[in-house]
């Protein structure tokens, strides 16, 4: 889809760049596939802020997207329409099965209403089909890749994202991710063919602070602009540089310090995404 720019009738329209969504369905989502979504404002069950700079924003309805694709194996479904989803950057597709059941899936690029999609052990390599990564040829572009068999897709789910199959060995498949990381995934893990829709999402410009507030994002304050009680960089008469290496509000070094602690899955990462920065 193309990008939309606007005549600078107001200051905020001057910088505004949006994705043209005129081809998407304009009605409401399927009620049976939705549920209410209450906003947390970044607070936990004790009411304490666990994620800063969140709150407000437009009320949303949660669409139940099928990330597993294992319900009706071998049954071809028809794409009824492509929809906007406020809860993610990608678009979603409503698919109809022959028995009348409906489902939402992540819409890949080049998927159109009327197309047929199928999930199964051995599927054609066309956008929207899903199957085990071990049955797909080397070089295939995939998205919505499972890390654990049957748990549902976890890798490459946001707008324009994808992973590429670069090898197979002893029941495992080697994937190259957009970050540059290469990792092993079990060959029985499901993945969907193609790259995720809405690749132009990276080019949008919101044009004004209020448009970020509509998304539920509050102003992000710098540590050096705070008081010493609020941040390690706070305080000082006039403008100061912080006086120490950059840290988070909790004193953990930022800008490059490794924080990964899951050693159990280190064996599956063949090449770290940090290697290409050196």
Curated annotation (Swiss-Prot):
MF GO annotations: rRNA binding; structural constituent of ribosome; transferase activity
Region called Disordered, residue ranges: 222-264
Pfam families: Ribosomal_L2, Ribosomal_L2_C
Keyword set, alphabetical order: Ribonucleoprotein, Ribosomal protein, RNA-binding, rRNA-binding
UniProt GO cellular component terms: large ribosomal subunit
Listed InterPro entries: NA-bd_OB-fold (IPR012340), Rib_uL2_dom2 (IPR014722), Ribosomal_uL2 (IPR002171), Ribosomal_uL2_bac/org-type (IPR005880), Ribosomal_uL2_C (IPR022669), Ribosomal_uL2_CS (IPR022671), Ribosomal_uL2_dom3 (IPR014726), Ribosomal_uL2_RNA-bd_dom (IPR022666)
GO biological process: cytoplasmic translation
Family: Belongs to the universal ribosomal protein uL2 family.
PANTHER family the UniProt entry points to: LARGE RIBOSOMAL SUBUNIT PROTEIN UL2M, RIBOSOMAL PROTEIN L2
Function statement: One of the primary rRNA binding proteins. Required for association of the 30S and 50S subunits to form the 70S ribosome, for tRNA binding and peptide bond formation. It has been suggested to have peptidyltransferase activity; this is somewhat controversial. Makes several contacts with the 16S rRNA in the 70S ribosome.
Subunit structure and binding partners: Part of the 50S ribosomal subunit. Forms a bridge to the 30S subunit in the 70S ribosome.
Protein name: Large ribosomal subunit protein uL2
């Amino acid at each position: 889809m193309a990008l939309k720019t606007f005549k600078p009738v107001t200051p905020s329209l001057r910088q505004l760049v949006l994705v043209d969504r005129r081809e998407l369905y304009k009605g409401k989502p399927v009620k049976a596939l939705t549920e209410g979504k209450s906003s947390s404002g970044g607070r936990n069950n004790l009411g304490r802020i666990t994620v800063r700079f969140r709150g407000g924003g437009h009320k949303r309805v949660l669409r139940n997207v099928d990330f597993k694709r294992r319900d009706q194996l071998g049954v071809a479904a028809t794409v009824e329409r492509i929809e906007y989803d406020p809860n993610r950057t990608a678009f979603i597709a409503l698919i109809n099965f022959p028995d009348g059941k409906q489902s939402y899936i992540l819409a890949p690029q080049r998927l159109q209403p009327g197309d047929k999609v199928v999930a199964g052990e051995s599927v054609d390599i066309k956008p929207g089909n899903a199957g085990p990564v071990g049955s797909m040829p080397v070089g295939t572009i995939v998205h919505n890749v499972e890390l654990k068999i049957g748990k549902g897709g976890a890798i490459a789910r946001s707008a324009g994202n994808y992973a590429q199959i670069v090898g197979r060995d002893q029941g495992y498949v080697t994937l190259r991710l957009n970050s540059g990381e290469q990792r092993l995934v079990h060959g029985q893990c499901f993945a969907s063919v193609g790259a995720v829709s809405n690749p132009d999402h990276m080019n949008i410009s919101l044009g004004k602070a209020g448009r970020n507030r509509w998304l539920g994002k509050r102003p992000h304050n710098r540590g050096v602009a705070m008081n010493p009680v609020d941040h390690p960089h706070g305080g000082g008469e006039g403008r100061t540089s912080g006086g120490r290496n950059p840290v988070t509000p909790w004193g953990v070094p930022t800008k490059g310090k490794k924080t990964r602690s899951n050693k159990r899955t280190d064996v599956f990462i063949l090449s770290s995404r940090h290697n290409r920065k050196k």
